[in-house]
Design a protein with these regions (language model features):
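Short secondary-structure boundary segments
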Residues: 249, 272, 294
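Acidic/glycine-rich phosphate/pyrophosphate-binding loops and surrounding catalytic core
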Residues: 2-225, 229, 233-240, 244, ...
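Active-site loop ensemble at the mouth of alpha/beta enzyme cores that anchors a bound cofactor
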Residues: 305-309
Length: 309
């Protein structure tokens, strides 16, 4: 930085760990998935017959063992949800993982072994797979984006473009893929975006500087980030003491000019229209951060199977 920054770069490149997630909240998500499957939760008219009518035909008290297997190369994520899901259906099943979240697996690799009540295993298998396939898809796609940046000093961040109620899981998956987490919600950073500036009548000039300065002075212990969509907004943002300047939908030449203008007076972040193909060029510009929600909202579920042993 060209001046004494209020916050180090490390402040803005954190990763959610599994222990950061609230187990009670995760149990609620699993519980919703369970009653959706067994009792038609979400339907205005609940079914008269509840439960798993197919598994009810299986031998009572039967025990079983099954293997979780990667059916294609992937970065695994969500293993902590497997035991939580089993326990939601019953107390007599065990999951023994042979991989760990964030690990890259090849086709055919074993992820873990499920054992216990056949009834519980049969009822829970689709919910388990839904979580693992989705979160592993996010982690795998994120890994591709991180790899595309290569040895660049630019740090890949996620966004708040997440499925409602699943944010912490999707951000955790992004971290498992090697990315870093942007703000978790509206509570942990002041982020003046274009609509905030429009409401404040502060899209440029002195009014823009005054609005940013008010945020910096009022929120002394909270980082202040400002989204700009023109080069002309950069100097007022710098003069007001913004901690991070988000360069929204700038072209490559504009980004290069913006980095030169900012000259280390604030941390820089590029966002908008970020693709795998553009990352190598973006990584050469000297940007501090590159943020994209694509690995979360454009990822494909990965093929994972549960096979009876």
């Amino acid at each position: 930085m060209g001046h004494e920054a209020r916050y180090s770069k490390d402040t803005f490149q954190t990763r959610l760990q599994w222990q950061d997630l609230d187990p009670d909240y995760l149990r609620q998500l699993v519980g919703l998935a369970k009653i959706e499957d067994l009792a038609g939760a979400g339907l205005a008219n609940r079914p008269e017959r509840l439960g798993d009518v197919t598994t009810a035909l299986m031998p009572e008290g039967a025990k079983g063992k099954a293997q979780l297997t990667a059916r294609e190369p992937l970065t695994i994520c969500g293993l902590g949800l497997v035991q939580t899901t089993l326990e939601s259906y019953g107390q007599n099943c065990l999951f023994e993982a042979t991989a760990e979240d964030g690990q890259s697996l090849d086709q055919g690799d074993t992820i873990g072994i499920l054992s216990g009540s056949s009834t519980v295993l049969l009822q829970a298998e689709r919910v388990i797979l839904n979580f693992l396939q989705h979160l592993s898809g996010v982690a795998t796609e994120t890994r591709l984006y991180v790899d595309a940046l290569g040895k660049s000093s630019s740090v890949l961040l996620d966004t708040r473009k997440t499925l409602p109620a699943y944010r912490v899981l999707q951000k955790y998956a992004f971290a498992c893929g090697g990315g870093y987490n942007h703000r978790i919600g509206l509570f942990d950073r002041v982020m003046l975006k274009d609509n905030h500036l429009a409401v404040a009548g502060a899209t440029g000039g002195n009014r823009l500087s005054e609005t940013i300065a008010l945020a910096v002075n009022t929120c002394e212990n909270i980082p202040v980030e400002v989204e700009v969509d023109t080069l002309e907004q950069i100097i007022p943002a710098l003069d007001a003491g913004a901690d991070i300047i988000l360069l929204d939908n700038f072209s490559l030449p504009e980004l290069k000019q913006a980095v030169s203008m900012i000259e280390g007076r604030a941390w820089t972040e590029a966002s908008g229209g970020i693709t795998l193909d553009s990352l190598s060029d973006l990584g050469d510009l000297g940007l501090d951060f590159i943020s994209t929600g694509a690995p979360i909202h454009q990822s494909r579920w990965k093929d994972i199977g549960i096979d009876w042993l």
